[in-house]
């Protein structure tokens, strides 16, 4: 199993880095993660996932892998960034004035997108379901967890 994962990581490393850098460069604050959400949804759709999203979720969404014949495991990431000016000088520095992923949410999203891609690419067989949940506004109170719960993202 590990060698299969190692090979997949070697084959996809550059794409994963590209995704993380795009996310880092385009941060958006809570409930305004429109571009971020659409980017992540687009990637999930390209992998073959069906996106579940509704008005109550605002910019949040989720995608399921597997079947309903067993437990559901939810893996969650945060879509939002912080209203903090980035002072780094890297080529993927935030292009949005006064907003940055100083919180690491760009890495969280990349981890979830990478896992979703690995599972789809290698057609992992599971009894149950993995729900990839992309939560908006984690940094706000009350934040996006409340809207995702109200929208039924924890049901099923």
Please name every model-derived segment.
Residues 2-101, 114-127:
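Acidic/His- and Gly-rich active-site-bordering loop/insert found
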């Amino acid at each position: 199993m590990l060698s299969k994962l190692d090979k997949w990581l070697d084959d996809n490393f550059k794409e994963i880095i590209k995704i993380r850098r795009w996310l880092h460069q385009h941060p958006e604050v809570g409930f305004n993660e429109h571009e971020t959400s659409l980017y992540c949804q687009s990637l999930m759709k390209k992998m073959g996932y069906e996106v579940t999203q509704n008005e109550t979720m605002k910019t949040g969404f989720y995608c399921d892998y597997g079947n309903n014949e067993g437990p559901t495991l939810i893996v969650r990431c945060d879509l939002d960034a912080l209203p903090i000016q980035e002072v780094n000088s890297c080529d993927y520095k935030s292009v949005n004035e006064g907003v940055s992923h100083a919180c690491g949410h760009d890495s969280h999203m990349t981890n979830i997108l990478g896992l979703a891609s690995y599972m789809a690419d290698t057609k992992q067989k599971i009894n149950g379901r993995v729900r990839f949940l992309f939560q908006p506004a984690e940094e706000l109170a009350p934040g996006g967890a409340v809207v995702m719960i109200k929208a039924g993202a924890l049901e099923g």
